[in-house]
Amino acid sequence: MRALRVSQALVRSFSSTARNRLENRVAEKQKIFQADNDLPVHLKGGATDNILYRVTMTLCLGGTVYSLYCLGWASFPHKK
């Protein structure tokens, strides 16, 4: 029973300290993303969002092209 209390105290102290260190920045992010500046929402976060968007689109396009290539390669008979 004592071990249970000790473990609960440890979990409580770790979870509360981690929660107290982080400040709530939701209001700041809401102002940024709700601003009327004619940018798409996936680019309002700045350069990081732009890079992340381009990398994601490149990987998706590359995967699509590669899957079509593999389908084309598999659809023709192979010489043995």
From Swiss-Prot:
Residue ranges, Mitochondrial matrix side: 22-46
Extent of the transit peptide: 1-21
Subcellular location, record wording: Mitochondrion inner membrane
One GO BP: mitochondrial respirasome assembly
Chain ranges on the Mitochondrial intermembrane side, renumbered to this chain: 76-80
Record's keyword terms, sorted: Membrane, Mitochondrion, Mitochondrion inner membrane, Oxidoreductase, Transit peptide, Transmembrane, Transmembrane helix
Record's bilayer topology term: Single-pass membrane protein
GO molecular function, one term: cytochrome-c oxidase activity
Disulfide-linked positions: none
Pathway: Energy metabolism; oxidative phosphorylation
Pfam family name, one: COX7a
GO CC, alphabetical: mitochondrial inner membrane; mitochondrion; respiratory chain complex; respiratory chain complex IV
Segments passing through the bilayer: 47-75
InterPro entries to which the protein is assigned, alphabetical: COX7a, Cyt_c_oxidase_su7a_sf, Cytc_oxidase_su7a_met
Presence of the UniProt keyword Membrane in the record: yes
Family according to the record: Belongs to the cytochrome c oxidase VIIa family.
Quaternary context: Component of the complex IV (CIV, cytochrome c oxidase), a multisubunit enzyme composed of 14 subunits. The complex is composed of a catalytic core of 3 subunits MT-CO1, MT-CO2 and MT-CO3, encoded in the mitochondrial DNA, and 11 supernumerary subunits COX4I1 (or COX4I2), COX5A, COX5B, COX6A2 (or COX6A1), COX6B1 (or COX6B2), COX6C, COX7A1 (or COX7A2), COX7B, COX7C, COX8B and NDUFA4, which are encoded in the nuclear genome.
Function of the molecule: Component of the mitochondrial respiratory complex IV (CIV, also named cytochrome c oxidase complex), the last enzyme in the mitochondrial electron transport chain which drives oxidative phosphorylation. The CIV complex is the component of the respiratory chain that catalyzes the reduction of oxygen to water. Acts as an assembly factor that specifically drives the homodimerization of CIV complexes, mediating the formation of mitochondrial respiratory supercomplexes (respirasomes) containing two CIV: supercomplxes with two molecules of CIV show improved activity.
Name by which UniProt lists this protein: Cytochrome c oxidase subunit 7A1, mitochondrial
